[in-house]
Amino acid sequence: MVTRLRLVSRSSRYATVKFTDSVSACSCRRLFSASTDPEPESQPEQAPPTNPVTGDEKLRNLRVLLQQNRIETARGVLSSLLRSDSTPFASPKELFSAFSLSSPSLKHDFSYLLLSVLLNESKMISEAADLFFALRNEGIYPSSDSLTLLLDHLVKTKQFRVTINVFLNILESDFRPSKFMYGKAIQAAVKLSDVGKGLELFNRMKHDRIYPSVFIYNVLIDGLCKGKRMNDAEQLFDEMLARRLLPSLITYNTLIDGYCKAGNPEKSFKVRERMKADHIEPSLITFNTLLKGLFKAGMVEDAENVLKEMKDLGFVPDAFTFSILFDGYSSNEKAEAALGVYETAVDSGVKMNAYTCSILLNALCKEGKIEKAEEILGREMAKGLVPNEVIYNTMIDGYCRKGDLVGARMKIEAMEKQGMKPDHLAYNCLIRRFCELGEMENAEKEVNKMKLKGVSPSVETYNILIGGYGRKYEFDKCFDILKEMEDNGTMPNVVSYGTLINCLCKGSKLLEAQIVKRDMEDRGVSPKVRIYNMLIDGCCSKGKIEDAFRFSKEMLKKGIELNLVTYNTLIDGLSMTGKLSEAEDLLLEISRKGLKPDVFTYNSLISGYGFAGNVQRCIALYEEMKRSGIKPTLKTYHLLISLCTKEGIELTERLFGEMSLKPDLLVYNGVLHCYAVHGDMEKAFNLQKQMIEKSIGLDKTTYNSLILGQLKVGKLCEVRSLIDEMNAREMEPEADTYNIIVKGHCEVKDYMSAYVWYREMQEKGFLLDVCIGNELVSGLKEEWRSKEAEIVISEMNGRMLGDVTVDEDLSATEKL
């Protein structure tokens, strides 16, 4: 029969100990109530000598104290023994074993006392767990309070694996764990990211009719939210309500955070509304979580509404709130708004810490506002802020982004003057910028500088260099860097190989890219989906669709799921090669895999069908996009408007009117070209006027369309004024413009005017299109302008553009 004993009393700070030696029940009761029944001596009891010579003497002293029922003295001696550096026992477990051998009749009493001291006075939690397992092997079982305390301390000291093992050991006995014990075990499982184990224990406790607490539900909901299992988290929330448990503020905050991180801020709002209905007052954490999620989703206006509600309810933003606002406005490219928040914080007397300040500085640096960043940093330093490495690195990166490498170096010097040693992150900013500029020699000089300063290049440093040389297609240097990394003991990672593979694919070196992939696999670095996507994209861009699908099959064979980027790349490759039926099959497969097509998916299909001349299918795909809630991009409208020109003005105008985006030059030119092709020059010139009013810069394509339209409606004399306007805008006409003009005159059979324009074109060194040249020569000969025709033929042949063919009848006439 397992011995059980209450070790830690709820009403006393002392352990309750059951003695098996000849100690009276009266004495025991006195000992267990030491706080209310003091020992009879008026003077504090003196412990035996504290420096016995041997371990045996220490054990004998403890045995005597226990036999004399002097529990508190024994506790003090035991606590000192455990803390002593000169203790003869390697561990508490060894101490227990030694005591058990010397005093077997007291081993139960001693075990309880030892466990109590380990948990309470000494806080030796790992040793307490080891002792627990040793006691179990001896058939000794601690009390419920002892186990509760042990599990609680194990969780607090983050010994989650041990917590689970102790609890499973408890389950294996005939001991009935308490609700608190289950809670600690479930908490440990969730902390280990093993929500499955937590749910298993959760179901076990319900089976044993131990009803979970709000704490346990909160722990599991938190674990499910962190794993983005929001449906399961919702089910647990509903179960709480069904059991008439009132969700706490923590419950609601956890769900709000989960939905935000899962990219579903709309659901977060619903949880917030549920809080209001249940009269649960929000906390600052509630609002901070909502703000972070909304900014992440790009819902800036909604975030600002939440901020207003927060202030209306009397909440004062803290440093973390300001960090969220700075980061949120930054990620949504609203640095000016971030500056406004900063001024509000200053006016409110909020003191910026280094973390919050670094986020604001990063926002400004990303948008190239390095001068403003310096101004704010100066203001904060005047208030006592001491810049740390993060702030300096942020500023160095800001200078590098703007191309001010002198300013970046000055910041490095400022770091050194402040006693900080710039690390690889600081130097990487400079190295990256030189690589972006293609100045690899300067990049290498920076690497040498950091080495001289005692800073070893990091994997990221080498990866930056690989990318720099790769973009210049200097692949031999890339391989040299890989070798240098290995020689220095810096193992290339997935990014190292991925950077090189990507550059090789962009440089049409597909064979070499595959060799690098095999090399990384041989070195134990497994390619991820991103690397496979690079290879697939490289194959598709070269029209090697079969090779692309070979890689996709290899992915599946290795258990790597195809993601949306993979499918989009394959669909784009199929669409470019006219294999539209196969592309549509992949579109269906995307949905079957639980993925959602995006705008890139549809743009590829629209482009493919457009190239095939199937405008109706393009429009159908566009309508399907809208029904699915996918917002078209400017590229979508570029494709559709250029394709719909032949379909007429009405369809083009409908597409133009449906745009929720600000039209760019390509869109305006597409619509204007449609008007010109269909001869509606009034609308064409009105649109040109609108472009000028909206500061949309006109280009040669704009004027080419206007010239084409004027020629279409027979206003040949107006063409010269458009050419003059182009010249006034320093937009000198080139070959394409002159070809349009010559062809336009030929189409209305004004061949001599066409010839005049040809002469101007020729004098400026531009070449006439061969087909247009044939048309011009034929027309000139029809009008008996053989001399001009011969000049055109001679000049075009002289330009090595091939012979200009004319009808045999015209040739015969020429001979006459």
UniProtKB/Swiss-Prot annotation:
For this chain, one GO molecular function annotation is: zinc ion binding
For this protein, the record's InterPro entries field holds: Pentatricopeptide_rpt (IPR002885), PPR/CCM1_RNA-binding (IPR051222), TPR-like_helical_dom_sf (IPR011990)
Listed under GO cellular component are: mitochondrion
Swiss-Prot/TrEMBL PPR repeat ranges: 108-142, 143-177, 178-212, 213-247, 248-282, 283-317, 318-352, 353-387, 388-422, 423-457, 458-492, 493-527, 528-562, 563-597, 598-632, 633-662, 664-698, 699-733, 734-768, 769-803
Sorted keywords for this record are: Mitochondrion, Repeat, Transit peptide
Q: Name its cellular compartments.
A: Mitochondrion
Q: Per the entry, what span does the transit peptide take up?
A: 1-39
Task: Identify the stretch annotated as signal peptide in this record.
Answer: none
- UniProt region (Disordered), positions on chain: 34-57
Q: Which PANTHER family match?
A: PENTATRICOPEPTIDE REPEAT DOMAIN CONTAINING PROTEIN-RELATED (PTHR47942:SF16), TETRATRICOPEPTIDE REPEAT (TPR)-LIKE SUPERFAMILY PROTEIN-RELATED (PTHR47942)
Membership in a protein family: Belongs to the PPR family. P subfamily.
Q: What is the name of this protein?
A: Pentatricopeptide repeat-containing protein At5g12100, mitochondrial
